Amino acid sequence: MLQYKPLGRQATVVIAGELDHFAAPQIRRMLDDVLKDETLLHLTLDLENLTFMDSSGIGVLLGRLRILQSRGGTMSVMNMQPPVEKLFRLSGLQRVIGIEKTHKGGRL
């Protein structure tokens, strides 16, 4: 469900499956474990294999963004499937979470 690739002060996390009410607590815990590294300043979420996300997922992402922002960091997403990208745009998430078309370092 989640793969993690650190690279200096940034990391890429691959989230797969669904990010809904049922999966949100587990994904939140996993992302919080990644963010325990306080030197991490940028988190990229690779959502290529994320098939569904609801408001619970939005909450998870915004909560982790707040953690990063509290230390001067940022978050971005990449490789979104059309339904997830539509939710991003309808909810306005693209205004606070950057959208990358491809990862700078290549795919995981």
PLM regions and their residue ranges:
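STAS-like cytosolic regulatory interaction modules
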Residues: 1-51, 66-108
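ABC-family nucleotide-binding domains
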Residues: 54
